């Protein structure tokens, strides 16, 4: 079980991210690629968590090295999902991935996404939003 205080902090952060995106004019009806960030001190530890996330139905990016502020090197990857900009759906994913991170002793470093232009001409106007999606991947 993920730390309740950290979960609450993430819930607040989720609502802030969504609010800021919508205030900036991002499309409220778009499907968003949600990038959950994981990091670890070594590749083997991160790979175990990434494999488990993949088994749960998430896409996983290739690991890469990142130098953090104090000069240390960490190995990181993104755990990807696609969903509506819905706080409850994202909260469910965050809780699932924070629990996974705790299990494998890796860091859950939050999530992010990108602005979706409601007037964008990307030809992907047939986005499907699954109203029954509870955010948890199996």
UniProtKB/Swiss-Prot annotation:
Pfam families: RraB. Residues 114-138 are annotated as: Disordered. It is found in: Cytoplasm. Residues 118-138 have a biased composition (Acidic residues). This is Regulator of ribonuclease activity B. Belongs to the RraB family. GO terms for molecular function: endoribonuclease inhibitor activity; enzyme binding; protein homodimerization activity; ribonuclease inhibitor activity. The keyword Cytoplasm applies. Induction: Constitutively expressed. Expression is increased by a reduction in intracellular concentration of UDP-GlcNAc. The gene is rraB. It comes from Escherichia coli (strain K12). GO terms for biological process: mRNA catabolic process; regulation of endoribonuclease activity.
